[in-house]
Amino acid sequence: MKQFIDFIPLLLFFIVYKTEPRAVDILGNSYTFGGIFSATAMLIISSVVVYGILYIKQRKLEKSQWLTLVACLVFGSLTLAFHSETFLKWKAPVVNWLFAVAFAGSHFIGDRPLIQRIMGHALTLPAAIWTRLNIAWIIFFLFCGAANLYVAFTYQEFWVDFKVFGSLGMTLIFLVGQGIYLSRHLHDTTPNTPKSED
């Protein structure tokens, strides 16, 4: 459910981006609705609204949601301020790479890999499996960041389509693969305490 909520601002961004640009009169002022810049404004506004509602209901946001929101505000604001979509193109790569750094850092900070801290309450797995799973997420985030960067600056005509649906597709494929991998170890009741690699 959380993933679908996080997807709402991106979906609204996509809808506005695909809308044929046209002039809209608001309080006597003329604005252009449709295209990359009004879509960016929609992304910022909808992100603040969605995560604001989540914060009010839950009294907190997950660290990943804070990172997504801050990145949206920073890169979105720079895009509008300098009237250049280049800043927005860097948002997905930077966010993905920061996630990769966080997952990688958890191997050296704390007693458990980050993926175990996230999913450990629901699954009991050997420490070696948690380590492999965490490394898989690091590789996934690095790949997603590189793929987003490559498409954004090489295939500009459909980088928004890839940003919205390509990233979602890669995530779903990865999650299916993760599920298949985990299904082989779900009956292993070895305590999930950290241990050194052989």
Curated annotation (Swiss-Prot):
The chain crosses the membrane at residues 36-56, 67-87, 90-110, 133-153, 162-182. Its main location: membrane. The keyword Nuclease does not apply. It holds the Pfam family IspA. It comes from the Bacteria. The keyword Translocase does not apply. Keywords: Cell inner membrane, Cell membrane, Membrane, Transmembrane, Transmembrane helix. It is found in: Cell inner membrane. It is a multi-pass membrane protein. GO terms for cellular component: plasma membrane. Plays a role in cell envelope biogenesis, maintenance of cell envelope integrity and membrane homeostasis. PANTHER family: INNER MEMBRANE-SPANNING PROTEIN YCIB, INTRACELLULAR SEPTATION PROTEIN A-RELATED. Belongs to the YciB family. This is Inner membrane-spanning protein YciB. The gene is yciB.
